[in-house]
Amino acid sequence: MLNVYIGYDSVETVAYHVLAHSILRRSSIPVSIAPLMRTQLKGIYTRARGPTESTEFSLTRFLVPALSGFRGWSVFMDCDMLCRMDFAAIAREIGRQSDKAVLVCKHDYTPSSKRKFLNKIQTVYPRKNWSSVMVFNNARCKALSAAYVNSASGLDLHRFKWVRDELIGELPIEWNWLVGEYKHNAKAKIVHYTLGGPWFKQYRNCAYAKEWRNELKLARHAKVER
């Protein structure tokens, strides 16, 4: 069973549900999906939300190894994504890079816009968006204790100051394809609406919007027995 945690934000609830559906619909291996919700982390996550935290899960994502009991492997994903791949591929990658502490897509880019969804500030820093898809080898991420996550700076967390560089494995960049930053790619495996997704009026015609709306329709479907 592969445990998957999806960041949950109260202003993007539909994004969580569509992403979860897109994963379940394509996976040929057992996956367990859980929302990473601040309201469920009382007593574990104690810090106040900072002005540069654009989502409710900006920093709670780094609690995934602790929430997993520092055992096994766990996946974290931002909610503003659409899965177009079988998660069996992630399991295979875990097998190939079992010596690493965390696997990420190593983006090297500068954001094209100073603002993103809901007019929020686009913070620029090294290793931007590496943390939006993380595959944790939980036993090797014990530095991410609740005490550390509650006290470390956001930049130190997102820039992976908690792990040695040689322990950061690399995933194909197509597994976190940045919509609005990268050109359209028919082979993208996980589409990331990092500037804003089609559930926001401003981005309803963004790249891959039609695919997302189709996934929403499929998620809403229920066959009624008569």
What are the residue ranges of the model-derived segments?
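A glycosyltransferase accessory/donor-loop signature
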Residues: M1-L2, V11, H17, I29, ...
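Hydrophobic targeting segments
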Residues: N3-I6, I23
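Conserved catalytic core of nucleotide-sugar-dependent glycosyltransferases
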Residues: I94-L157
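Active-site-proximal specificity loops/subdomain of glycosyltransferases
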Residues: V31-S68
